Amino acid sequence: MTIYDQILANKTAGRKMFALLIDPEKCSEEWLCQVMSTVNSQQSTDNSQLFIFVGGSQLKESVFDIVEKIKRMTTVPVVMFPGDASQFAENADALLFLSLVSGRNAKYLIEQHIEASRAIKSSGVECISTGYILVDGGKLTAVERVSHTSPYPTTNPQLIADTALASQLLGHKMVYLEAGSGANRPVPQNIISETRKAIDIPLIVGGGIKTPQQMMDAFSAGADLIVVGNHIESHPDTLASLLNQL
């Protein structure tokens, strides 16, 4: 079963999913051991609801080594969450092939994809095309700075939902609503709900989620998979309480 098939099966069965986002430039050996221990102690028998995302907006080093290290520590699937074409590791289980559909910067709509396409195809790594939509999280985020694009305002849920639908019609397999790393607030429930009603494909939501209640609010609004990263970087002891919500 592919990673995408696994996600679809969970969505169809109503099983919610969680991804821990690891930024290789921000994780120490001690932190990684701690969070992997928590993940392994919480995981279900088949790991089907858990994922490790690896990536960041400003990575400068190769991610191959960190992916290899994580895969030695857990059987949970490792999925690349790349900020650009250089952030590709052929030892990952899958790759989110992100297109920044909320922006109009061609570099992140298609140019980075062209640059990485041959390496991805030759590697054989599963590639999951994903429409990536930035939503205002109340502060300037790294992805805004790097991509030179602005997030959609939370006052226009229809625009966000329509963009998600356009993404689906373009052939993207998933939609990712992103408030940004370290956002002051997560993606609002009404935006998640409107987007969920507009699309049939899996819906990922990340950015600004810090508590089990915020996670459950996103799930109840229609998110299929929640991504948490920045908060766990500074509060690794809270990971178990989030995983317990699955």
Label the predicted regions.
Residues 5-25, 126-151, 188-197:
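N-terminal small/glycine-rich loop or linker at the start of catalytic domains
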Residues 80, 84-97, 198-228:
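Catalytic cores of alpha/beta
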Residues 1-76, 148-174:
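Conserved N-terminal beta1-alpha1 strand-loop-helix module at the mouth
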